[in-house]
């Protein structure tokens, strides 16, 4: 039950973030719903394609889709009311979603007997793939590739799950907590990976 609750928090966070980006880009109501749904479920869809799970399995998550649609509707109807609280709790909710989705993606891949590399990729795509698709559809540079450390924490979760270091559910919850704390610290202290800017002069 607790794991389902964490997934719901993640779905709400991702759906809301997609809807907010769509409204920032002045998309119409259809665009708001599409970007919200893609952000919440896009990473899982790509993961399923790569690890051999039928994409149609996503349609079995009817309750999650309803939650996402309701969240997007609330954002669209009452943006100011929600954003007042979103600025305070949005990053934490997003961190919860990242950790929960990354671990779930890794567990999917392990269950299907995939190698470690596939487990890590599944974790990264499930945790951050939706955000990447959201930014690309909005014509933005993917934030997860240039802002505070984000996808790395999903990869770390996939690595630990793939190596089989967690023997029970308690271990998974410990990993979840660690990933959430790491992500929260990333945006609180502006942790970033090294980067190098290069422009070719004409």
Swiss-Prot record:
**Which Gene Ontology cellular component terms are annotated?**
plasma membrane
Cell compartment(s), UniProt: Cell membrane
- The organism's superkingdom is given as Bacteria
Coiled coil regions, renumbered to chain:
none
| Protein's UniProt keywords contain Ligase | no
The reply to whether Cell membrane figures as a keyword in the UniProt entry is yes
Signal sequence, renumbered to the chain? none
Q: Which keywords has UniProt assigned to this entry?
A: Cell membrane, Membrane, Transmembrane, Transmembrane helix
Q: What is its main location?
A: membrane
TM helices/strands, residue ranges: 3-23, 26-46, 63-83, 90-110, 113-133, 160-180
The way it spans or sits in the membrane comes to: Multi-pass membrane protein
A Pfam family (short name) is: Gly_transporter
Which protein family is it in?
Answer: Belongs to the UPF0126 family.
Query: What name has this protein been given in UniProt?
Result: UPF0126 membrane protein YvgT
**Protein source organism:** Bacillus subtilis (strain 168)
């Amino acid at each position: 039950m607790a794991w389902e609750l964490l997934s719901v928090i993640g779905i709400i966070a991702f759906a809301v973030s997609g809807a907010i980006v769509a409204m920032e880009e002045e998309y119409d109501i259809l665009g708001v719903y599409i970007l919200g749904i893609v952000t919440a479920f896009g990473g899982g869809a790509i993961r399923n394609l790569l690890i051999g799970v039928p994409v149609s399995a996503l349609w079995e998550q009817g309750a999650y889709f309803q939650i996402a649609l309701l969240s997007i509707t609330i954002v669209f109807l009452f943006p100011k009311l929600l954003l007042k609280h979103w600025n305070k709790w949005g990053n934490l909710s997003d961190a919860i979603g990242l950790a929960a989705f990354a671990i779930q993606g890794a567990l999917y891949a392990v269950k299907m007997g995939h190698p470690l590399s596939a487990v890590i990729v599944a974790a990264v795509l499930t945790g951050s793939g939706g955000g990447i698709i959201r930014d690309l559809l909005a014509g933005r540079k993917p934030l997860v590739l240039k802002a505070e450390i984000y996808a790395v924490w999903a990869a770390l979760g996939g690595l630990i799950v793939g190596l089989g270091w967690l023997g029970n559910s308690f271990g998974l919850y410990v990993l979840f907590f660690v990933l959430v704390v790491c992500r929260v610290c990333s945006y609180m202290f502006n942790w970033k990976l090294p980067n190098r800017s290069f422009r070719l002069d004409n």
